[in-house]
Amino acid sequence: MSTLHKVKAYFGMAPMDDYDDEYYEDDDRAERGAARGYARRPREDRFEEEGYIDRAGREYDDRPAPREYDEPPIYRGGYDEPRFDPRLRGPREFERPAPRLGALRGSTRGALAMDPRRMAMLFEEGSPLAKITTLRPKDYSEARTIGEKFRDGTPVIMDLVSMDNADAKRLVDFAAGLAFALRGSFDKVATKVFLLSPADVDVTADERRRIAEAGFYAYQ
């Protein structure tokens, strides 16, 4: 429709039906043109306009499935911990190798050690301990033997290791009373090992220590 014809129709100088028909024809042509333009656009442009394609240009159906991890990664100090491998593990303190048997030879010390040279010095002729004897009572009934040896002037070592605690305590009380009655001395040498010394035998603290170190009472 020309501009002049539109002006005439507006002021009633031309029929309105012609104006309406041409108006609707223009609208139909515009809609058909838009439809043809939409159909001619690439498939990706149409999908992107309607929201079916993401920003990376991939269709939703083409997205890879998320990876599945067997186990979550472990972080310590800002980096991934290496996989545990027993071969790479260093020695732990409680897994120290056992010492060789050869290293234990000659390592006995204290009351269980026996030095022949010390034994000779302790019990050389003329020494107060030259006639010492060791008794290993099994029960309290052997207290009489201990008393007789001590009464005859013989130093006695009482080894009570094999006795139960009750009988050992009774025998210790007996020996202490015996030493007090005969003016002797009663000394502990090692665990459950005691020395009864007569009044005329003076055993110094150093000699008692050497007796314990020599450990001769365990071998007599």
UniProtKB/Swiss-Prot annotation:
Residues 52-70 have a biased composition (Basic and acidic residues). It is found in: Cytoplasm. Residues 33-82 are annotated as: Disordered. One of its GO terms (cellular component) is cytoplasm. The keyword Transport does not apply. PANTHER family: CELL DIVISION PROTEIN SEPF (PTHR35798:SF1). It comes from the Bacteria. Keywords: Cell cycle, Cell division, Cytoplasm, Septation. Cell division protein that is part of the divisome complex and is recruited early to the Z-ring. Probably stimulates Z-ring formation, perhaps through the cross-linking of FtsZ protofilaments. Its function overlaps with FtsA. One of its GO terms (biological process) is division septum assembly. Belongs to the SepF family. InterPro entries: Cell_div_SepF, Cell_div_SepF/SepF-rel, SepF-like_sf. The keyword Cell cycle applies. This is Cell division protein SepF. Homodimer. Interacts with FtsZ. It holds the Pfam family SepF.
